[in-house]
Amino acid sequence: MEAVLTKLDQEEKKALQNFHRCAWEETKNIINDFLEIPEERCTYKFNSYTKKMELLFTPEFHTAWHEVPECREFILNFLRLISGHRVVLKGPTFVFTKETKNLGIPSTINVDFQANIENMDDLQKGNLIGKMNIKEG
């Protein structure tokens, strides 16, 4: 099987960008629904300075997600599923960032948890999450 790469026209670029915006909105909604919390616990925005799509959580979420043991795995798996990209756990804060290329297409999602990580050795070695690739076009 052969893959043929073609340059996207303006309409295709716009459609792809819209798809990723919708995916982020859907992620936000699913996380809020999954936690069954009446108030919104996360919001997403495009940071024009850093050129990153960010999914930001309120401080209340940092404690709320502990009440749902499956929440961390659910979020990681869902983000991998919708993006097809690598998901990395790191850092002291709980912020999702999505780096974008020049077309606004995400290339990486960093998932930072403010929480107790069970195995810090795995975290430091970067062994927690595997890599997934997708073909876009």
UniProtKB/Swiss-Prot annotation:
Transmembrane segments: none annotated. It comes from the Viruses. It is found in: Virion; Host cytoplasm. One of its GO terms (biological process) is symbiont-mediated suppression of host toll-like receptor signaling pathway. Induction: Expressed in the late phase of the viral replicative cycle. The keyword Zinc does not apply. One of its GO terms (cellular component) is host cell cytoplasm. Its main location: virion. Belongs to the asfivirus A137R family. Interacts with host TBK1. This is Structural protein A137R. It comes from African swine fever virus (strain Badajoz 1971 Vero-adapted) (Ba71V).
